[in-house]
């Protein structure tokens, strides 16, 4: 939320015509996901005043490791991960709650420059979760994999369902086809803000991420199987669902080696 406030203050101080990247993305223009249809999706929650609050999404990649966005985490806060959840406001009977034991942010991440990339972090859980029909590990792409333009993808999360709207209590999904780097980095889209280590998806002005989905997965259908190709990173500060401003994700396939090393040696 701090990053949201930073960008909001830029708008308040007379920069409303500029297009800053806005982190903390959420699902806009989507629909409620079928219960537990995305079993690698997690809710990252922080402790405040004795209560837990959803702040970001994430992806279960090992029984005791979660992948999320670097801008979602802080060493000054206490976090937990909830797996197997669908409705955050009620007990579904399928949830597992696990404390975050260690936060590993990519060493090149710069919290003052989200557009530089490296918006990825791994969370080591205090204990391994139990895999079942409601909790599964994500399939990750091979290192270096690049999505074809217009590849079918879905974003999922509990974020806002419209710009400046309320958080969703039930998991939402929205169809966001991928946008090729050559298009997304063109001057009529994101320009030089987008890097080759990112994935763009959507941009139709209707469906997008928005504040609250950050850190969550972009599930893409490749060779008949859904795999997580993106970590939700930022949207336009002009609004979540702005035409030709696709939701931008950290490209998972650019960080496979880094993640494998962190997991092996941490």
UniProtKB/Swiss-Prot annotation:
The keyword Disulfide bond applies. Residues 17-26 form a propeptide. The active site is at residues 71, 119, 214. Pancreas. Ca(2+) binds at residues 85, 87, 90, 95. Residues 1-16 form the signal peptide. Its EC number is 3.4.21.36. Binds 1 Ca(2+) ion per subunit. One of its GO terms (cellular component) is extracellular space. It catalyses: Hydrolysis of proteins, including elastin. Preferential cleavage: Ala-|-Xaa. Serine proteases that hydrolyze many proteins in addition to elastin. Belongs to the peptidase S1 family. Elastase subfamily. This is Chymotrypsin-like elastase family member 1. The gene is Cela1.
């Amino acid at each position: 939320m701090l990053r949201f406030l930073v960008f909001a203050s830029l708008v308040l101080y007379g920069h409303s015509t500029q297009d800053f990247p806005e982190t903390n993305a959420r699902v806009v223009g989507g629909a409620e996901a079928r219960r537990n249809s995305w079993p690698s999706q997690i809710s990252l929650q922080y402790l405040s005043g004795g209560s837990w609050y959803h702040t970001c999404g994430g992806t279960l990649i090992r029984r005791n490791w979660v992948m999320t966005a670097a801008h979602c985490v802080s060493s000054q806060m206490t976090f937990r991960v909830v797996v197997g959840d669908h409705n955050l406001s009620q007990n579904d009977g399928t949830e597992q709650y696990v404390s975050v034991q260690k936060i590993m942010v990519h060493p090149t991440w710069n919290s003052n420059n989200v557009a530089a990339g490296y918006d990825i972090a791994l969370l080591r859980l205090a204990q391994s979760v139990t895999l079942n029909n409601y909790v599964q590990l994500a399939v990750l792409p091979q290192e270096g994999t690049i999505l074809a333009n217009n590849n079918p993808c879905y974003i999922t999360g509990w974020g806002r369902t419209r710009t400046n709207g309320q958080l969703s209590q039930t998991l939402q999904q929205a169809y966001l086809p991928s946008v090729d780097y050559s298009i997304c980095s063109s001057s009529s889209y994101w320009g030089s803000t987008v890097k080759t280590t990112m994935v763009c998806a959507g941009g139709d002005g209707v469906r997008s991420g928005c504040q609250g989905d950050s850190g969550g997965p972009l599930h893409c259908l490749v060779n008949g199987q859904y795999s997580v190709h993106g970590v939700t990173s930022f949207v336009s500060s002009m609004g979540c669902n702005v035409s030709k401003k696709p939701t931008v994700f950290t490209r998972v396939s650019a960080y496979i080696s880094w993640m494998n090393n962190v997991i092996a040696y941490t």
